[in-house]
Design a protein with these regions (language model features):
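N-terminal export/assembly segments and adjacent metallocofactor-ligating motifs
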Residues: 2-38, 46-50, 66-73, 87-452, ...
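Long hydrophobic segments that form regular secondary structure
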Residues: 258-275, 280-289, 297-299, 310, ...
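Structural motif
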Residues: 328, 390-392, 460, 556, ...
């Protein structure tokens, strides 16, 4: 017999009644007057006020007439800074001549130096200043002098432009940078009439979140270089969308004109991204219109050349090649849930194999077992981060690998001093902002960093995909979470990886987290799919598939959205692609299409509908933003290819795939056991040897960032990081060049001396001049030589 758990006590909220324009409303104590008015549907004009920023009362546009218990304030007050009080009576511009006159006066004052260039301003048509000047301002200006002018525009970064004469000094941008992003690169300079938004000398606005300042600017003072002078809001067709770049799960909006994406904006979802997004999600969409976009099927002819072909010709060639021998499926980590489910079903039903893996990166068998036992059904969420007593980061850099997670951590740190522990070899910029407890360990020895932590049921462990590179680390993380009852979440970099697990796009799991090895699970899926049986053997991993293809055991590969150069066995991967019959589903030329026998063009995110599951397992559905696109989704192509082969998968639309996957549901039987792996012994270093550690930066050489030069302009500088002790030993100072090498290759980078383990050297994994996997063949925990160049 079990007893019901005691419900946590809910603290009573003190309510205060206030009268606004003759209407009474009760709101929680501490509510600002401007928010109380909104409860009644009364709109008080404002510019500086923003519900997610601390009140500042900078613009004075929200002045109202207030009295408390019969005593009137001597002057109108800023409703965005004053909380409600018992006995308060508020009269807004709707019922008070005093408030109306004050607001008109402020509006007239703000427009004295404003250029009134609405016809050419990007904000025209969606501008709060324009709207409120019409609604709350005077019909004509009394000003007859010369307006103040500035050089325009000035670049405060490569992607954000500032027109200073339009600025109303609301301080939204500076407050966002400081309070939300933790990037104090932008400030209000000078005083009085000379005050203006600016950056520090020789320090551009290099923030991963700078685009949010453009979106929340209430005038056209801040504009994005990509969208400037491109369209009016009423020219655009807006569609709710989701971000394809990481697993944060941001709500987004895509704006299209004449079949072309012109801008993307952060949507509003308080449970995930509030109303923010990162610059990569906002501006990295031009890959969709790249000049080298594949738009027609290609088939390799007898001369070895890829030539355009019709869809029937390409499908016939693909079907023949995939059925000529043993085949396997590789699908990248950016597929939608529906597309991943299509690959999963195609592998089992059409090809009769469990040889499928979505992990087109450095991975391990330990990780595969961990995903099956710890991720399926895991319900750790952003709310758990908000309520955590401490958060532990293991092989995970939130600012670089899941930016909205970083913003939520920063929010909790600012509001209640959340304690963050970072187990790593190098102290990152993001963790410095969070004032994290830096547990410095040698690369590959992260397990030791867990031993000194005292965790509780309210603690949260966030482990990144790079934990797969350290043997025994996922085992240790799983163990400490089980013993302490702390919440555990796995946060990959790519948007589609959590959904791929749920869809069964991995060799040890069927859809819904059903173990391939479980007979009941196979019967379950066989019945759902209407087939007489499914393959029983556990499928091969990505590395095993490449190895089997390279030695001839696997004859054909179906590859969707995979870059073989993202893994650690690049030479074997390329050899496998060269020797196999390859069918590639891809948008642009790649190392796969260069070796493919058949290339089938697929739709970009804006050209199809679907769903991404974020790291929480939360579905983020999106509609087609460019409905006239002729490109087909992966799912649609897989469906017609299965028809061509003669073993149909029976799902050709997103709605069909989603309905079928939802009807299957999550497995409620026994999960796969996670036996665990022991940690590897630490290597012995000598002389100039060091252990390499790295991660991918948010803005790097990723192909989905291609075509957006302005975004690349704010990428962090490529440097090698070593400790003061190592710098002294090899005789270098900041800015000197160092050479990092191993038996495969070498790279030369400027050095930065800062907080890092003495045995370690850090370099970005995939940035300009530092493509570690391609140059050195390794990314982390490997011995390299570091010398002065």
């Amino acid at each position: 017999m079990t007893t019901q758990a005691e419900k946590p006590s809910v603290e009573a909220v003190e309510m205060i009644a206030v009268v606004i324009d003759g209407f009474e409303v009760s709101v929680p104590k501490g509510t600002l007057v401007i928010r109380a008015a909104e409860k009644l549907g009364i709109q008080i004009p404002r510019f500086c006020d923003h519900p997610l920023l601390e009140p500042v009362g900078a613009c004075r546009q929200c002045l109202v007439d207030i009295e408390i218990n019969g005593r009137k304030f001597p002057k109108p007050q800023a409703s965005c800074t004053i909380p409600v009080e018992p006995g308060m009576i508020v009269n807004t511009q709707l019922t008070s001549d005093v408030a109306d006159k004050a607001q008109k006066g402020i509006m007239e004052f703000l427009l004295v130096n404003h250029p009134l260039d609405c016809p050419v301003c990007d904000k025209g048509g969606e501008c709060p200043l324009q709207n409120q000047a019409m609604a709350n301002g005077n019909a004509e200006s009394r000003f007859t002098g010369y307006k103040r002018t500035f050089e325009k525009p000035i670049n405060i970064s490569s992607q954000v432009l500032l027109d200073r004469e339009r600025c109303v000094l609301c301080a939204r941008c500076t407050r966002f940078a400081d309070q939300i992003a933790g990037d104090r690169f932008i400030t209000l300079n000078e005083r009085g009439a000379l005050q203006q938004v600016g950056i520090y000398e020789e320090q551009p606005f290099e923030s991963y979140f700078s685009g949010n300042t453009v979106q929340i600017c209430p005038v056209g003072a801040l504009t994005g270089a990509t969208y400037r002078f491109r369209a009016r809001p009423f020219d655009l067709v807006s569609t709710p969308s989701a971000c394809e770049h990481c697993a944060s799960g941001c709500d987004m909006r895509t704006d299209v004109r004449r079949g072309k994406t012109l801008r993307r904006l952060a949507g509003e979802d308080p449970t995930v991204n509030d109303e923010w997004n990162c610059d990569k999600g906002r501006w990295a969409f031009k890959y969709q219109t790249a000049q080298d976009r594949i738009t027609t099927p290609l088939v390799r002819n007898a001369a070895g050349e890829l030539v355009p072909a019709s869809w029937p010709e390409a499908l016939e060639a693909a079907a023949a090649g995939l059925t000529a021998g043993r085949a396997a499926v590789l699908v990248g980590g950016r597929a939608t849930v529906e597309d991943a489910y299509g690959y999963s079903k195609f592998a089992r039903v059409t090809l009769g194999t469990n040889d499928i893996d979505f992990r087109s990166r450095v991975s391990s068998d330990e990780e595969r077992a961990f995903l099956a036992s710890n991720v399926i059904g895991n319900q750790t969420s952003y709310r758990d981060i908000d309520n955590a007593d401490q958060v532990v980061l293991v092989s995970f850099e939130p600012e670089e690998e899941s930016p909205i997670v970083f913003l939520r951590l920063n929010k909790a740190f600012r509001k209640r001093a959340l304690k963050v522990h970072a187990i790593a070899s190098k102290l990152s910029i993001g963790n410095e902002k969070l004032k994290a407890n830096f547990i410095c360990v040698a690369p590959g020895n992260e397990v030791s960093g867990l031993s000194g932590l005292t965790l509780t049921e309210k603690s949260v462990i966030l482990v990144g995909e790079r934990a797969a590179e350290t043997p025994g680390l996922l085992t240790a993380v799983s163990g400490i979470a089980a013993r302490s009852k702390a919440k555990l979440a796995w946060i990959p970099r790519r948007a589609g990886e959590r959904g791929a697990i749920e869809a069964g796009a991995i060799g040890n799991l069927l859809p819904g987290g059903r173990p391939v090895s479980d007979a009941a699970a196979r019967v379950d899926i066989s019945a759902a799919w209407g087939v007489h049986g499914l393959p029983e053997a556990r499928g091969l991993s990505t590395n095993e598939i490449y190895a089997a293809a390279a030695n001839g055991e696997i004859k054909a590969l179906l590859v969707g959205g995979v870059d073989p150069l993202d893994g650690s066995n690049t030479s074997i991967a390329l050899d496998a692609l060269q020797k196999s019959f390859v069918v590639s589903l891809e948008m642009r030329p790649s190392a796969v299409t260069d070796r493919a026998n058949v290339v089938l063009p697929v739709a970009a995110v804006a050209e199809k509908s679907g769903t991404f599951l974020n790291w929480e397992g939360r579905g983020r559905s999106f509609d087609i933003a460019i409905p006239d696109s002729i490109q087909r989704s992966d799912l649609r192509i897989l469906s017609v290819l299965a028809d061509q082969i003669g073993r149909k998968i029976g799902i050709s639309t997103v709605a069909q795939a989603a309905a079928e996957l939802n009807s299957i549901g999550t497995w409620d039987g026994n999960k796969s056991e996670f036996g665990g792996v022991n940690a590897a012994p630490a290597p012995t270093l000598s002389g100039e040897q060091a252990l390499l550690t790295s991660w991918r930066r948010l803005l790097d050489n990723g192909s989905l960032q291609d075509g957006e030069a302005n975004l690349a302009g704010t990428a962090r500088k490529t440097v090698a990081v070593i400790s003061p002790k190592r710098a002294s030993a090899i005789g270098v100072t900041d800015g000197d060049l160092v050479k990092i090498s191993n038996e495969k290759g070498a790279l030369v980078l400027p050095v930065l001396i800062e907080a890092i383990h003495d045995d370690a050297v850090w370099a970005p994994r995939n940035s300009a001049g530092s493509e570690l996997l391609r140059t050195l063949g390794v990314a982390s925990n490997s011995v390299v030589t570091v010398v002065k160049a």
